Amino acid sequence: MATTARDVMKTEVRTVSPDISLTDLEKLFIDNRVTGFPVVESERLVGIVSRSDIVRKIVTEQSYAEYVSDYYRDVGSFDEPRPADTLPELGSQIGSRLASATVRDVMSQEPVTVSADDPVSRVAEQLVKRRIHRVPVVASDGRLEGIITSLDLVGLLVDREPG
């Protein structure tokens, strides 16, 4: 009989609310020694959030701040703005926008998921194909049942190796 997601998944899953701040999220990353969490609201999976989502948000905010600062630059001036003059302003703009951001603002809203009955080969295929490190296991009604990480699959391989 083929190994299924149910055989490999962890059922004790730490989740986060979509409404917590990114500051609180970072504390949870550190405290739990992980880089991502399923996002759950009313017992249903609504997304997944990882550190790379936060980095993406920072880069987006920086690009936006640079665009706005270029737009408002005095085009009649012959003086080139120096990076030292604009960097603190950009940092302040990015910081204030990120300070009010929540998990909902950065999470992946349509995460790749599998069902508990899916073969583990499908789970591995999704991790590789989508270049992700974790996949939530969900019931047909959207409830989170567990999670499988790439390390869980590596552990499965190690356990199968002859002594």
PLM features: residue spans?
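Tandem CBS (Cystathionine beta-synthase) repeat/Bateman regulatory domains
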Residues: 1-163
